[in-house]
Structure formats: C-alpha cells, structure tokens
Amino acid sequence: MPASFPLLAVDIGNTSTVLGLADESLSLTHTWRIRTNRDLLPDDLALQLHGLFTLAGAPMPRAAVLSSVAPPLGANYAFALRRHFRVDAFEVAAENLPDVTVELDQPGSIGADRLCNLFGAERYLDAYEYAVVVDFGTSTNFDVIARGRRFLGGILATGAQVSADALFARAAKLPRITLEAPARAIGQNTVHALQSGLVFGYAEMVDGLLRRVRAELPAPAVAIATGGFARTIEGICREIDFYDETLTLRGLVELWASREAVGKGL
C-alpha cells in the first residue's frame, strides 16, 4: 500500500465530527460520526482515534487531512496525529489552495468546510456550470460554486435544530420533539403541528432560497444536500437534486489528492 494511505480525513464541525479512511483509489472504506467535544486534549483524541480504528478492524492512517471550524480542536487533532501516529496532517485553509478562486470580499475568511464542499461538488459539474451545496449542520450553509474551482459566495442560515432549541427555550410548555416530517401539513396535535412548522417550514425556506440563488445565476445550477439534517428533509425539498451524505468528507479527500498532485507536478 502506498505510504500516503490509508488517508484519514477529519471534518470537525460545531456539533459533530465526521471522520473517514480512504484507500489509494480515494474511496472511503470506513466512516464515523462522533460528537464534537472541545474539551478533549491531544492524548484524549489519540485514544479515541485508536479505539475507532481498532473496533472497526481498520488500519492505522499514514497520512491525514483536517478541516476544522473549531481551530483549537483542529490543532489538538494535528498534535495527536503527529505525536501518537507519526502523521503530519494537512490543515485546510484558503491560502494553502492556490488553484481555488474565492470570490468573497475577504477570501481568507472562508471556512475550511466550505472549501471541502467545493471539491466534493466537482463531480456534479459535468453537466452544469454551477452547483449549490446545501450543508445542513449547526447552521445551514448554501455554497455557490462554479466550474474551475470558483467559490462565488453563499447564504448562512440558522440550523433546524438550533431553531427548534430556541423555540423550546422561549416556550416552556411546548414539548421537545424529534425533528421528523409528519404525515400531513395540518397538525391535529401539538407534536405534529410543531413537526410541520419546523420540518416543512424549514424545507420551504430552503426551496425559496434555492430559487433565489438560481434566479441570480446566468445558467442552470445543480443543488446537492449534505450534512446530518439532510436525511430528515430528503424528498421534501423540491429544489434539491441530489442528497450526498459524504460530500464534505469526500471533498476533503479529493482536496488532499489535488494538492498532492500539484506538489508532485502531475
């Protein structure tokens, strides 16, 4: 097996951290989703990683790539990998990707996960000039991408669970519910009425924003949903074309491979 594989990809979000091992074909052979815990020290993370690999019967990584929206935790992962696995992780940032054009007022402010989505969406651009990745996480991000690795901008909205938590915190008599779609829009009890408003209402917001984005682009755009909440609204949003649960993680792997190819002059 080449020295750079297995490759460990780590996407550290505000709520969840998604990890995957990729082989030399850049296919994800193992994936995990764990809760993001900012209190974990490098040695804690090393034990956690070793436990995940061991339980899955997976090989230890020989290279790593990190995307983090929690910089202190990203640094702890990098230190844990270096100290305990002898792996120097590549940490994603706009300044490390010269082949990417970030068309923002402040290009350096782009989040690492947005760049991963750009690479993950490339396979959908064969038939389209533009793509919109809707990433359902703690926040819901709309990433607008064009061929040629151009990040055009996006939309940032409150995540569905955050909206629900805010409602429950302000209305003490409302029951905390599971965010899932009810059978019909007109609820005949409190739980179903809440589910209709929170799930169907959220889907309508997503559809409306996608229509606005498409109206501003000069050519058709493909829309792809990813992130934890994407499973809940799958089939409900009419404007989303594809659901790709591993888009960000796969984009992280392909971003790393692209950088390696540039470094080797391929």
From Swiss-Prot:
Cofactor note: A monovalent cation. Ammonium or potassium.
InterPro entries in alphabetical order: ATPase_NBD, Type_III_PanK
Pathway membership: Cofactor biosynthesis; coenzyme A biosynthesis; CoA from (R)-pantothenate: step 1/5
CDD domains in the record: ASKHA_NBD_PanK-III (cd24015)
Active site annotation, chain numbering: 113
Any GO BP annotation: coenzyme A biosynthetic process
Coiled coil spans: none
Highest taxon in the source lineage: Bacteria
Cofactor(s) needed for function: NH4(+); K(+)
Predominant location: cytoplasm
Subcellular location: Cytoplasm
Disulfide bridge map: none
Residues noted as binding K(+) in the record, renumbered to the chain: 135
SUPFAM superfamilies in UniProt: Actin-like ATPase domain (SSF53067)
Residues that, per the record, bind substrate: 111-114, 190
Keywords, in A-Z order: ATP-binding, Coenzyme A biosynthesis, Cytoplasm, Kinase, Metal-binding, Nucleotide-binding, Potassium, Transferase
Keyword Transferase: yes
GO cellular component: cytoplasm
Chain positions recorded as ATP binding sites: 11-18, 138
Catalytic activity: (R)-pantothenate + ATP = (R)-4'-phosphopantothenate + ADP + H(+)
Protein family membership: Belongs to the type III pantothenate kinase family.
Quaternary data: Homodimer.
Protein's UniProt name: Type III pantothenate kinase
Organism (species): Deinococcus geothermalis (strain DSM 11300 / CIP 105573 / AG-3a)
Gene expressing this chain: coaX
